[in-house]
Amino acid sequence: LTTNDIQAVVEPLFKREREKKEMAKLFQALRIEVNQEMIALKEMLNSASEVLKPGGRIAIITYHSLEDRIVKNVMKSGNIEGKVEKDFFGHITAPFKLINNKVIVPSNDEQERNPRSRSAKLRIAEKR
């Protein structure tokens, strides 16, 4: 089964004006599933706090909202679900401290030079 075969089957299902975007989403979803990208991302994030020394930094570039939500949750709360855990005194016990309070996105100039960068988001955190 080739990408052209898949495209031939699903193309009639999309409206003409949205066909390119919908096709891109379809192939992105297939790639994510086939490569098990979400599983790999979660495994890497779960082990990051174990392998980094205090003061060590992790920088992650995400390219779509599902990845970004997972990375943001882990960096803010220390877990994939985004549940903030507190100690007895009410202090947040997350293993990371955010380095950049706002996500870093490509400048307009970068996006003009490299259109594929338009969806990229960079998040940086430091091990406590």
Language model features: what each stretch is:
Residues 1-128:
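S-adenosyl-L-methionine-dependent methyltransferase catalytic core, i.e., the SAM/SAH-binding region
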